[in-house]
UniProtKB/Swiss-Prot annotation:
The lineage of its organism: Eukaryota, Metazoa, Ecdysozoa, Arthropoda, Hexapoda. PANTHER family: HOMEOBOX PROTEIN HOX (PTHR45659), HOMEOTIC PROTEIN ANTENNAPEDIA-RELATED (PTHR45659:SF22). Phosphorylated at as many as 16 sites. It comes from Drosophila melanogaster (Fruit fly). Residues 76-85, 190-199 have a biased composition (Pro residues). This is Segmentation protein fushi tarazu. Its main location: nucleus.
Length: 410
């Protein structure tokens, strides 16, 4: 009985110390209380049971992290809530574990973590291990999963799921607040593959106008198209009011006044048009110097004058207008007769017709052959085919009213 109670004065901790002598981390038996060391062994065993791979990697590469584990007290029954750790340290641990799984050498790992710019050896996870130092993000947003190289779109477009229980860092990184903060600052964990380059709205490149106060409409349309294409947020946020203001200001500046010609300039231009409907460039330059006008103004005046003459011809070609309008302008036949010789009266407009058509030798008709009325019939067709100016209509109407005078021309 004495032998069985002889060990009763020893404490339970001393007995456990005696039994745990051959523990791989046990201490030699002492007279002091070693109950704290036993609790340490239990906590260490529990931690190794939950994180076998990370404990090994931390013992190899991060010795300081072992001291952090000793201060933590992990509850025995909570498998779904791992101990919270610092976000930055957690990202480094994940990167270290992935590279260790790929069988990376410790020297290469330290070189990659300390000097991310210099690439010593190609690895599929090189971008994810060095993006933190290169981007200099305020909050570490590097998330490495078990897959060696996840796609960029998966990391950028993933919808935040707060109910996921992978780890605490996932919630910190992919929370809506952090995403909005990253969108505001413009710092992304991985840049999206198709990021539109937002350019400031550029001013439209417009060519200088030919004359002051004039701007081509093509340049304005190019300016509008250029601003629409280079708008940062598309056509939805495009400032159309600004374009309308610029167009209104351009129209005010480019409003031209109608060119007014003096009576002397108009008279000289009418004289030139009477002889030549189409003028050469040399003649146009001479007229411009004589009338103190620009070459462009003279060209436009002749174009407008030809259009006006064409409209007048279309109105005067009707037989009613021809018979009523130009017969009143003809002089009487008795006034043109010669009183001294008593020769048959010859109408003056017939000779005036040959004088005015002298400038057009191709249109004039030769009367040297005496063929009578048969020779004068093609002349009427010639006048109907080539209509140059109103005098021809005048003579044509005179032929219709006085056919007996054609005999005197032969």
């Amino acid at each position: 009985m004495a032998t069985t109670n002889s060990q009763s004065h020893y404490s339970y901790a001393d007995n456990m110390n005696m039994y745990n002598m051959y523990h791989p981390h046990s201490l030699p038996p002492t007279y002091y209380d070693n109950s704290g060391s036993n609790a340490y062994y239990q906590n260490t065993s529990n931690y190794q049971g939950y994180y076998p791979q990370e404990s090994y990697s931390e013992s190899c590469y991060y010795y300081n992290n072992q001291e952090q584990v000793t201060t933590q007290t992990v509850p025995p029954v909570q498998p779904t809530t791992p101990p919270p750790k610092a976000t930055k340290r957690k990202a480094e641990d994940d990167a270290a574990s992935i590279i260790a799984a790929v069988e990376e050498r410790p020297s290469t790992l330290r070189a990659l973590l300390t000097n991310p710019v210099k690439k010593l050896k190609y690895t599929p996870d090189y971008f994810y291990t060095t993006v933190e130092q290169v981007k200099k993000a305020p909050a570490v947003s590097t998330k490495v999963t078990a897959s060696p190289a996840p796609s960029y779109d998966q990391e950028y477009v993933t919808v935040p799921t707060p109910s996921a229980s992978e780890d605490v860092d996932y919630l910190d990184v992919y929370s809506p607040q952090s995403q909005t903060q990253k969108l505001k600052n413009g710092d992304f964990a991985t840049p999206p593959p198709t990021t539109p380059t937002s350019l400031p709205p550029l001013e439209g490149i417009s060519t200088p106008p030919q004359s002051p106060g004039e701007k081509s409409s093509s340049a304005v349309s190019q300016e509008i198209n250029h601003r629409i294409v280079t708008a940062p947020n598309g056509a939805g946020d495009f400032n159309w009011s600004h374009i309308e203001e610029t167009l209104a200001s351009d129209c005010k500046d480019s409003k031209r006044t109608r060119q007014t010609y003096t009576r002397y300039q108009t008279l000289e231009l009418e004289k030139e048009f009477h002889f030549n409907r189409y003028i050469t460039r040399r003649r146009r330059i001479d007229i411009a110097n004589a009338l103190s006008l620009s070459e462009r103004q003279i060209k436009i005046w002749f174009q407008n004058r030809r259009m006006k003459s064409k409209k007048d011809r279309t109105l005067d070609s009707s037989p009613e207008h021809c018979g009523a309008g130009y017969t009143a302008m003809l002089p009487p036949l008795e006034a043109t007769s010669t009183a001294t010789t008593g020769a048959p009266s010859v109408p003056v407009p017939m000779y005036h017709h040959h004088q005015t058509t002298a400038a057009y030798p191709a249109y004039s008709h030769s009367h040297s052959h005496g063929y009578g009325l048969l020779n004068d019939y093609p002349q009427q067709q010639t006048h109907q085919q080539y209509d140059a100016y109103p005098q021809q209509y005048q003579h044509q109407c005179s032929y219709q009213q006085h056919p007996q005078d054609l005999y005197h021309l032969s």
